[in-house]
Curated annotation (Swiss-Prot):
Its main location: nucleus. One of its GO terms (molecular function) is enzyme activator activity. Component of the 1.8 MDa SAGA transcription coactivator-HAT complex. SAGA is built of 5 distinct domains with specialized functions. Within the SAGA complex, SUS1, SGF11, SGF73 and UBP8 form an additional subcomplex of SAGA called the DUB module (deubiquitination module). Interacts directly with SGF73, SUS1 and UBP8. Gene3D superfamilies: 1.10.287.210, Classic Zinc Finger. The long N-terminal helix forms part of the 'assembly lobe' of the SAGA deubiquitination module. Keywords: Activator, Chromatin regulator, Metal-binding, Nucleus, Transcription, Transcription regulation, Zinc, Zinc-finger. Disulfide bonds: none annotated. One of its GO terms (biological process) is chromatin organization. It comes from the Eukaryota. This is SAGA-associated factor 11. It comes from Eremothecium gossypii (strain ATCC 10895 / CBS 109.51 / FGSC 9923 / NRRL Y-1056). Belongs to the SGF11 family.
Length: 105
């Protein structure tokens, strides 16, 4: 009879599969940690003074920690029909406008 990790535990399919699973998980976690650490060290070497992005729970500040602009009169021109649209409606208009053009042709 062959023994497992402990001298008292007999080698079974369950014990072998648990050992393989444990080794696989450990290897995956170590790989992820190693890659993340390497990326962070490379980023720190390339950009030594890089400040992390700011996260505001209230939503009043942008990712750089500055107050969000309250100007709602930002307009974009539709490349399909050349209409000027407000920024908050641009994506919805573009979806409708582009699908309308595809149906015509």
């Amino acid at each position: 009879m062959t023994l497992g990790r402990d001298a008292m535990t007999p080698l079974t399919i369950l014990s072998v599969s648990e050992t393989i699973y444990h080794n696989l998980l450990t290897s995956m976690v170590q790989d992820i940690v190693s890659r993340t650490t390497s990326r962070q060290q490379l980023q720190d070497a390339r950009y030594p003074g890089l400040a992390p992005l700011h996260h505001d729970q209230r939503g009043a500040l942008d990712v750089y920690g500055r107050p969000k602009p309250q100007e709602a009169s930002v307009y974009f021109r539709c490349p399909n029909c050349s209409r000027d649209l407000s920024a908050n409606r641009f994506a919805a208009h573009l979806e409708r406008c582009m699908s309308r053009g595809a149906r015509r042709g």
